[in-house]
Regions:
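Sec-dependent signal peptide recognition
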Residues: 1-7
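C-terminal motif of bacterial Sec signal peptides marking the signal peptidase cleavage site
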Residues: 14-16
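Mature extracytoplasmic domains of secretory-pathway proteins
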Residues: 60-89
């Protein structure tokens, strides 16, 4: 009887923790922007939807994400240490001489904002590269 109750308790706690993580992601907002004199791209992902703006005077296009794409984004997001985001450094510095647009990743989780310093669009810091590339892919669709 003890083993059965212990097993049920373990399953209950495990299920509770996984549903908590899922609800955390529904309130998390990821925003990627790339800006230069002639370029403006903004991608906002939140709660299985993506909003893409390609141009300063254009309306955003909002679409729903497939479950597979959402799980891919959540998997990459979970690998990131949010506290280290403000200290990340891009591998190149082309943005200083107009060689690349300025890229920026901003994450809002539990009403706290985590934002990278500017980096070259197309050359994100290695720690966030896969997530940024997933977000940039939405501007190509």
């Amino acid at each position: 009887m003890r083993i059965l109750s212990l097993l049920l308790l373990t399953i209950f706690i495990g299920t509770s923790c996984s549903s908590q993580k899922t609800s955390d992601m529904t309130s998390t907002q990821m925003e990627y922007s790339a800006v230069s004199r002639g370029l403006y791209k903004l991608v906002i992902v939140q709660n299985k939807t993506v909003s893409v703006t390609n141009g300063k005077n254009t309306q955003p296009v909002v679409t729903n994400l497939s479950d597979a794409k959402w799980k891919e984004i959540v998997a990459e997001f979970s690998k990131i240490n949010l506290e280290s985001i403000p200290t990340l450094k891009g591998p190149t510095e082309k943005r200083f001489y107009d060689g690349a647009a300025i890229g920026n990743l901003k994450i809002v989780k539990n009403q706290k904002i985590y934002e990278t310093p500017g980096f070259d669009n197309g050359y994100p810091p290695k720690e966030i590269e896969k997530l940024v590339n997933l977000l940039v892919d939405f501007t190509k669709e």
